Amino acid sequence: MNRHSTLLSLALLTLLVTGNLLVFAQQGLVANNPAELLRVGDKVIKINDAISMVQGFGNTFMVSTSEGNVIIDTSSVFHARKHHELLTAENKSPVRYIILTHGHGDHTGGVPLWKEAGTQIIAQKHHVDFMNYQTRLAGFYAKRNAAQFALNIPEPARWAGNYAAKIEPTILFDDKYEFTLGGVKFEICSAPSETYDHLMVWVPKYKALFSGDVYYESFPNIYTLRGTQPRWALDYVNSLNKVMSFNPEIVIPSHGMPIRGNAEVTRRLTQYRDAIQYVHDEVVKGMNAGKDVYTLMHEIKLPANLDVGESYGKLIWSIRGIYDGYVGWFDMDPVTMYDTSAASVYPDVVKLAGGPDAIARLALQRIEAGDAVAALHLTDIALAADSSNRSSLEARLKALEILQARCKNTNERGWLDYSVRATKASLGEKH
């Protein structure tokens, strides 16, 4: 591994333990190369005379007052230095406060750069628990993110302990916290959504609301493929209602560009809220009607007027996230109560079918019929009996490449790319 690759790996692993691909999804892009994630904003964007931002993997915002600056979110470790350089060139006043909308690494990565003697750092009280949760599973997430972003899989990490996170905030609050600096009032409210430590910031003087990740230009990641604690759909709904209750003239998300004008804010956030509410309610109705999660994943579709796009979050993942979040993993099938997986009997099925080549032929038939996902299931069965069976690996690669070619979701693309690389490696191909 050369020096550039090493630096790239270190930067991405640090960044991606808690980050995401949202910036690419919002631009309608699918990241095909890990280096694409490291593009740094190269200019300051003036939202108004007092509020400035720099875009990146996560945005950094500066609100300037006569008594000093307030920084809202600090981007990732990779972007933070450039963001700091650009914004301090704009205004060199002391940083009096740093406000963290939540504990993901693409919002907290620049705290050490912005923190000065006497700087107060504000977060919602659940920030402590959330940071400990992330640190507790740092090794797990490092492996997941390395897989998704084409990095070397790290060696197993030493467990740091249950409560080993570094806690930066000096002020923690429950529901609301307010302060005034240089005649500018800042009202901070709890807004659980993407995380349970999430907050938003209302600046009434400018009728501006910093919304963190309550809203972005895609259906939300109610479940994220890297794994996460439950994200509650109704938390999103309630927090979006709270955003709109301020009647803001400008909403400033931590990913993407501001939404300007109360009418446009109301239109977009109402559509977003109603889309989430619709999916949640349809899942709950289906659960109460006795439908299983796969039936609901197949049946539930957004009405055209609520279609907010699926470039980042995806409907079927959110449906399953809502379902499993409410009731967990037991599906009423007694076999799932025990510690023997379905895959453990796949070799018996393969033997009965006449060997893995026979299953591979069936997978190819499914591909020809247009069902690449069913083909993947069949290759799972075949490869459980013989992990090096070439015809099964070739069928698997063909199915994956079909899914890859039609993929329009950034997170989905990352995992398809990972599986393509792994399958090619098993076939002895370079990638």
Q: Language-model features: where?
A:
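Bacterial N-terminal signal peptides that target proteins for export
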Residues: 1-11
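Divalent metal-coordination and catalytic microenvironments
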Residues: 50, 63, 73, 102, ...
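Bacterial N-terminal signal peptides
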Residues: 9-20
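Metallo-beta-lactamase
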Residues: 27, 46, 69, 76-78, 94, 129-190, ...
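Active-site metal-binding motif and surrounding structural segment of the metallo-beta-lactamase
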Residues: 44, 66-67, 78-123, 172
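Accessory terminal helices/loops
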Residues: 16, 25-34, 140, 245-250, ...
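Conserved beta-strand hairpin/beta-sheet module of binuclear metal-dependent hydrolase folds
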Residues: 41-90, 200-213
